[in-house]
Amino acid sequence: LESLGLFWDDKISRQSENLQEYKNILEILKSKNLTYNCNCSRKQIALSNQSNFNEPIYNNHCRNMQHPLSNKSAVRLIADHKSTKFIDRTQGPQHNNINNSVSDFIIKRSDQIYAYQLAVVIDDQLQSVTNIVRGADLLNSTIKQYYINNLLNFPDKAYMHIPIATINNQKLSKGSGDKVNVNNFSLILIEGLKFLKQKIEKNIEDASPREILKYAVKNWDIAPLQQIKNIELNPTQRLIADSAHT
């Protein structure tokens, strides 16, 4: 990141340092009767109906069971029939019934680790985050986080879900072992801007990463990204990705 001219604005925040905050918020949600303990296995959940996001939607089996908390219990947040409505800057208006879209979801895992959905909302609040930019494949996660954010009366955030990079319609990601060629940082930035359909002037292509970023901020245009969830890498961009494996 530093070689690309990307630096953080404040001190590094680690989730391991925020465990007490997570616990406090979880207790608040429990006190409002918004949670319950769940003993369902992954297999049971996988047999549930599929949501419109192509992932298992929980059937709320344990909602009224009143299971005592144990080391094997997950904690779920009750998803009522309220609508989540927000305007995404690239994907447009988002309107979902949280219960129909994702149903009751886990906020503390059965291994006693706080779930990402809860932790990231609290992290953003602690860091005074106002604008969230992420891949379009995480729109489903945003629905859950938006719901938690509202339950806790945290200030609304502005969202933008940008297209993800794909090769043959398969997501390019670190999770699948994909890497980036780090031999030419300026080229990486230029191709990244082209991927995001930004106009590139000839005189900026050989500039330093810092100069390229200044140019990108000044000339940023969101219009070409409207309603696009994924973009296939062009041959040059594929070469950058592929050459990292050689």
Can you name each region flagged by the protein language model?
Residues S16-L19, G135-L139, V182-S186, D206, ...:
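Generic detection of long, well-ordered alpha-helical segments
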Residues L1-Q44, L196-I212, A216, Q227-E232:
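Conserved alpha/beta enzyme-core scaffolds, especially Rossmann-like or related mixed alpha/beta domains
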Residues N37, R42-F185, I200, L233-T246:
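Active-site cores that bind ATP or allylic diphosphates and position pyrophosphate for catalysis
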Residues N150-N153, K194, D221:
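Hydrophobic alpha-helix feature that most strongly marks membrane-spanning transmembrane helices
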Residues I188-F195:
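Short, hydrophobic/amphipathic alpha-helical patches that form generic packing surfaces
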Residues N183, L187, I212-I222, Q227:
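Amphipathic alpha-helices and adjacent low-complexity segments
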